[in-house]
Amino acid sequence: MQRETVFDLIGVGFGPSNLALAVRLAERSGAHTLAHCFVERQPAFGWHRGMLLDDCRMQISFLKDLVTMRDPKSRYTFINYLFERGRLNEFVNLKNFYPTRVEFHDYLSWVADAFDDRVHYSETVLGIEPVRGDGARIDALRVLSRDAAGHERQRVTRALSVGVGGTPAIPDAFAALGRDRVIHSSSYLTDIDRLVASPDGERRRVAVIGAGQSAAEVFIDLARRFPHVDANLVMRAGALKPADDSPFVNEIFSPEFTDVVYAQPQDARRALLERYRDTNYAVVDRPLIEQIYEMLYLQRIDGTPRHALLANSAIEAAVRTADGRIELTLRDRMSGATRIERFDALVLATGYRRDTHSALLEGLAPHLGDALTRGDVTRDYLLATPEHFAPRIYLQGCCEDSHGRPTRCCRSWRAVRTKSARRSKTGSRPRTMKAWPGPRTKND
């Protein structure tokens, strides 16, 4: 095991949140003196690679990239990426605010390439341990990791930025069915050819479980790309609902609204988030809904309905049959009647769990008091730790319950303060809070 190296900051994970942090540190005056690095388990930068479908577009404007909303003069903007790639003029000619997901991934990779000397790829963080000082004081954190060759490494840091992303959510009903017939949408492009392979030329019936954007994208991709597949979209909802991305509602993704959400009592905050749930959860972009509706309609013309939307369907049970297929017991949520549907494979578009950070920080639990279990986080995304715990732990992408919906741009640069002179020691709410001003008007 190599000798410990001491850092001012270590980022665990190198997705968009910590990538935005790397940009902020690179551009901050004096930040070059800050010893920092990032540890990433993937062999190279990757962002939702399993869903980089060719014709799928971003749901946010390219202006909400890693840096434009903070500093449009930055060299790391999407516009400068287009300029450096020699495509700026052609992109302007498209007259489109929403690049393809493939292109935006290429932009993120382009930015990530600038920080190769700061990122340790193919390293899995095994755990975080406390470094003790005098008495009960915890002075620093020890990050334990293992690379692809099996070599273990220790690094000591005074601050930690946890940006590990989500973990695919697999509902209990599907957990025991086996990966040979069931995949999560996060690995769709990697696994789908194997999943629907038909050496004998027989048709394959595939169920997509979910009612959100990923479910809709997978459903229409299966229908268009695999002539031998009969795709079925199974969902509890009665219909695919469009995402609300109207201008006034989009104001909830502003920093000012985050202040408002954070200042609310827990019950009021929960109600406020529920009110705007249709901006992000179990909703689909309207153009995609229209494409799916048209596809299902056109089937009726030639009388060969291969694909179907099974709405109002609650899944009561899921079992493997003797021939290896999957049998779903579906209950009609309107009539209460049950029926059995059999499929050759399932794609679960069931979202992500946002609790990975808890397992990562488990070794620190005895020293953190109730902060970790309660999710006690300050407005600056800093875990509120006891007085004897000196290291700073910032949580990225897992604070929706306290801060509201993740903003539709990469804003982790706001979360991490690179100076250690001042830090919040409690998770208390601010005593006063300026009200959210609402949308600006011409009289402002």
UniProtKB/Swiss-Prot annotation:
One of its GO terms (molecular function) is ornithine N5-monooxygenase activity. Binds 1 FAD per subunit. Keywords: FAD, Flavoprotein, Monooxygenase, NADP, Oxidoreductase. FAD binds at residues 40-48, 59, 125, 408-410. Disruption phenotype: Less virulent than wild-type in chronic and acute models of respiratory infection. Residues 420-432 have a biased composition (Basic residues). Residues 420-444 are annotated as: Disordered. Pathway: Siderophore biosynthesis; ornibactin biosynthesis. GO terms for biological process: biosynthetic process; intracellular iron ion homeostasis. Substrate binds at residues 64, 250-253, 280. It is an enzyme of class 1 (oxidoreductase). Its EC number is 1.14.13.195. InterPro entries: FAD/NAD-bd_sf (IPR036188), Lys/Orn_oxygenase (IPR025700). NADP(+) binds at residues 211-214, 236, 280-282. Pfam families: Lys_Orn_oxgnase. Its cofactor is FAD. It comes from the Bacteria. SUPFAM superfamilies: FAD/NAD(P)-binding domain. It catalyses: L-ornithine + NADPH + O2 = N(5)-hydroxy-L-ornithine + NADP(+) + H2O. Catalyzes the conversion of L-ornithine to N(5)-hydroxyornithine, the first step in the biosynthesis of all hydroxamate-containing siderophores, such as ornibactin. Belongs to the lysine N(6)-hydroxylase/L-ornithine N(5)-oxygenase family. This is L-ornithine N(5)-monooxygenase. It comes from Burkholderia cepacia (Pseudomonas cepacia).
